[in-house]
Amino acid sequence: MKVVNKHQLGYVGKDFFAKIPVLGKWATRIRCLYLKRGNTRNSLRIINEGVEYLNDGFSLLIFPEGTRSWSSEMGEFKAGSFKLATKARVPIVPITLNGGYHLYEDQEYIRKGQTIDVLVHPPIETADMSRQELAEVPKKVEAMIREGLEQLK
């Protein structure tokens, strides 16, 4: 299997995805990172590896809720989801998605013909932020996405 990753984009997801035939191999080849929930050692390794990727010019897609939504309600953000970007001091581009829950309404199969609305927010530059400002980034991003979700509804 040949994988072309022209835009150098990977994602951070649950280790479950690595076990899916074809998808797991493809995702690993484009440098996706897999988290094992409850495994601190794995989380630290992923943070260090992710920071390396970001410093090498890769972009990583992270879903800060840590899971898919089964409704239009936004879940709680995981505190660690911002550690990669704030540690690497790279820009964060918040993206609001609305309607993805329709894809899994029966929670078994992906439904075809569904629409997902996407709103890309302005980047948040972290390079010159103080520790205090970095600590406030998760709340700022969550507020932006929550506001974006209201716009898209």
Regions inferred by a protein language model and the residue ranges of each:
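Non-catalytic C-terminal accessory region of glycerolipid acyltransferases
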Residues: 44-153
